[in-house]
């Protein structure tokens, strides 16, 4: 009788089990800006961003096993030592592993596959989590949000502004497309097809 095949450990398991922030300098082997991505998906944004910004220490959350493992594997093979992928729900881990005012930027990539109005209670950006993220971001830090669902984008923008994030373009205004920004795998499809993407680039006051 053959033995059952053991499943590999989740990517970034050591971070999932930590109760306090790790020594990020020791983890990455260098110091530099620390950035968080929630919802890295297929990894297009995280991988390209880390290629363009080798000075940044980038921590990406993705709860889908295939995407999380594939992204970390591709980063390792490409020699990107500045990317760590965590295969888990960011809402439960972020509160424990990042100190207050420690993040230079937060990237929120096309969250919430449950896009119907009746699914709003499942949305990642709720007031309590938005307030927590605000506390983790350093003064002057950037919150970069992108979604393809306009109603959800309007709601998230309102929540984020309500907890203190400032919109340089004015309250409730989405940010226009900037070709210098790094698109995600999903965003590239929308850019190619001409479908709209709703973006916001918010700041925490210095």
Swiss-Prot record:
The keyword Cell membrane does not apply. Keywords: Methyltransferase, S-adenosyl-L-methionine, Transferase, tRNA processing. It holds the Pfam family Methyltransf_4. Substrate binds at residues 116, 148. The active site is at residue 112. SUPFAM superfamilies: S-adenosyl-L-methionine-dependent methyltransferases. Its EC number is 2.1.1.33. Pathway: tRNA modification; N(7)-methylguanine-tRNA biosynthesis. It is an enzyme of class 2 (transferase). GO terms for molecular function: tRNA (guanine(46)-N7)-methyltransferase activity. S-adenosyl-L-methionine binds at residues 37, 62, 89, 112. It catalyses: guanosine(46) in tRNA + S-adenosyl-L-methionine = N(7)-methylguanosine(46) in tRNA + S-adenosyl-L-homocysteine. One of its GO terms (cellular component) is tRNA methyltransferase complex. It comes from the Bacteria. Belongs to the class I-like SAM-binding methyltransferase superfamily. TrmB family. HAMAP family: tRNA_methyltr_TrmB. Catalyzes the formation of N(7)-methylguanine at position 46 (m7G46) in tRNA. This is tRNA (guanine-N(7)-)-methyltransferase. It comes from Myxococcus xanthus (strain DK1622). The gene is trmB.
């Amino acid at each position: 009788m053959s033995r059952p095949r053991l499943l590999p450990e989740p990517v970034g398991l050591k971070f999932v089990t930590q109760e306090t922030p790790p020594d990020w300098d020791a983890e990455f082997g260098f110091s530099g800006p620390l950035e968080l991505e929630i919802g890295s998906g297929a990894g297009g944004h995280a991988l390209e961003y880390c290629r363009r910004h080798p000075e940044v220490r980038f921590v990406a959350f993705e709860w889908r096993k295939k995407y999380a493992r594939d992204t970390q594997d591709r980063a390792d093979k490409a020699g990107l030592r500045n990317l760590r992928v965590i295969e888990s729900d960011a809402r439960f881990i972020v509160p424990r592993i990042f100190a207050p005012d420690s993040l230079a930027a937060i990237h929120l990539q096309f969250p919430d596959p449950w896009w119907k109005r009746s699914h709003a209670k499942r949305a990642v950006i709720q007031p309590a989590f938005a307030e927590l993220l605000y506390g983790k971001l350093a003064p002057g830090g950037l919150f970069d949000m992108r979604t393809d669902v306009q109603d959800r984008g309007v709601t998230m923008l309102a929540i984020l502004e309500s907890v203190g994030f400032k919109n340089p373009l004015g309250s409730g205004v989405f940010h226009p497309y900037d070709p210098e920004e790094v698109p995600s795998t999903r965003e590239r499809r929308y850019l190619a097809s001409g479908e709209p993407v709703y973006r916001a680039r918010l700041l925490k006051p210095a």
